[in-house]
């Protein structure tokens, strides 16, 4: 199973295509300066050289399209078509107290992420843009949200609430 992992920022998009069975990174890259003059994509297939291409990316949707183009490219691509991408995992900075693990993205999850925008105003709105952009390009591919804050949900309560070591 090939999983496209996306970390979407306000003007950048990092990605890796990972084979979940072998855990190998098939390709990775970075779209920079999205919505700004001089935007480019740097793409590196497994075992290959980094390829940097200047390309106009006025929106995140165009950045996602550029990623798919590189992943399926005849020379530097690692899959033949979009059909070989089985799911997309989105790194989400803040899920509040609602999410203790990764979840399949639906309308309720989108609303809950949006409700946390005040907790991560530089990140969550960009994460939502990334999800919507991927949905536009890959409407039939399952999308999963992976929350930074879920890590903290599994900590013992005393470690979560206090910064000092717990008494022995």
Locations of the language-model features?
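A short acidic Gly-Thr/Ser loop motif
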Residues: 6-11
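A structured beta-alpha segment of the ubiquitous adenosine-cofactor-binding alpha/beta core
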Residues: 53-81
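Polyanion-binding loop/helix "lid" in catalytic or ligand-binding cores
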Residues: 123-135, 146
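Conserved small/polar residues in nucleotide/adenosyl-binding loops
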Residues: 162-167
């Amino acid at each position: 199973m090939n999983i496209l992992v996306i970390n979407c920022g306000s003007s950048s998009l990092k990605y890796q295509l990972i084979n979940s069975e072998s855990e190998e990174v098939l390709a990775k890259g970075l779209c920079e300066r999205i919505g700004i003059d001089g935007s480019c994509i740097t793409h590196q297939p497994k075992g290959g050289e980094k390829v940097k291409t200047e390309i106009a990316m006025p929106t995140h949707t165009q950045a996602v399209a550029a990623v798919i183009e590189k992943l399926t490219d005849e020379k530097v691509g690692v899959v033949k078509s979009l059909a070989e991408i089985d799911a997309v995992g989105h790194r989400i900075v803040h899920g509040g107290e609602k999410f203790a693990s990764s979840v399949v993205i639906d309308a309720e999850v989108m609303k809950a992420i949006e409700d946390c925008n005040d907790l991560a105003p530089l990140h969550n709105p960009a994460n939502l843009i990334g999800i919507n952009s991927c949905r536009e390009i890959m409407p039939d591919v399952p999308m999963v949200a992976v929350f930074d804050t879920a890590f903290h949900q599994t900590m013992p309560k005393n470690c979560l609430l206090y910064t000092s070591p717990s008494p022995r």
